[in-house]
């Protein structure tokens, strides 16, 4: 089996059409002009499935592609259009039988993620499966080569406005946002 990449969304940070926009693209009936925010899911040839970014559209992206299980999540950067679907990981955590779903991000994003979602990361009570929060475990990404869950990556930084974001190469595929 080869790797399989599913594009869950290829739109801008607002998605397409944009609310209140009356341009030709946003008014178009062409299904190619109806795009959710950017994310992919990769099913590797060694039977691992990983998600790149959790957009605010994540629930519909997963449902419309019949995705019920992932092994880990990669975050490319800390913008809202790449993070704010994080709560929709809850049902995917159920298959981990009380264990935390690993998510990977650059070390400089760890505090930002934890501060943006304190209800997930600042739990003081015992973790309860299905207790209203996703059970997630932060794992650092190291630039260069790294093996995650038997999946080999080469991670690198890219310019994205005034910040740097994470890109990666896996097998014969590269992901550049």
Which residue ranges define each predicted feature?
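Binuclear metal-dependent hydrolase catalytic cores
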Residues: 1-176
